[in-house]
Amino acid sequence: MTNDTVSDMLTRVRNANLAKHQVVQVPATKMTKSIAHVLLEEGFIESIEEVGLDINRQLLLSLKYKGREREPVINALKRISRPGLRVYANRKELPRVLGGLGIAVISTSKGVLTDTKARTQGLGGEVLCYIW
């Protein structure tokens, strides 16, 4: 088990995307579940399924591809805040990823949200990652 489950999740999704896998398996924690639900709401993945027993719970994420060439919907994932260097932003400093084409995943007091939802609710928080 790794200490940084968010980085582990992003790396697994990135590698599965590059290898054009249909499904990727990530450890199920509260944070990875929340990030997976944000990815599902934003249309980056097709579905989420939780499998396994209590201690070994896993999330199965169905990745999304477009066209005949099976181009990945997720072009890149970038971890921003990490255990060694936390990055926080208040509501006025929330980042825009690629001028609004991508999303920033923010951990707020109201849960894990995208940058646009956090901005409309007037919330700041920890900037977890960028996805475009």
Curated annotation (Swiss-Prot):
GO molecular-function terms, A-Z: rRNA binding; structural constituent of ribosome
Localization annotation: Plastid, Chloroplast
One cellular component term from this protein's GO annotations in UniProt: chloroplast
Key words of the record: Chloroplast, Plastid, Ribonucleoprotein, Ribosomal protein, RNA-binding, rRNA-binding
GO terms of biological process kind: translation
InterPro entries, per the entry: Ribosomal_uS8, Ribosomal_uS8_CS, Ribosomal_uS8_sf
Chief localisation class: plastid
Pfam families: Ribosomal_S8 (PF00410)
Entry function: One of the primary rRNA binding proteins, it binds directly to 16S rRNA central domain where it helps coordinate assembly of the platform of the 30S subunit.
Record-stated family: Belongs to the universal ribosomal protein uS8 family.
Subunit (UniProt): Part of the 30S ribosomal subunit.
Record-given protein name: Small ribosomal subunit protein uS8c
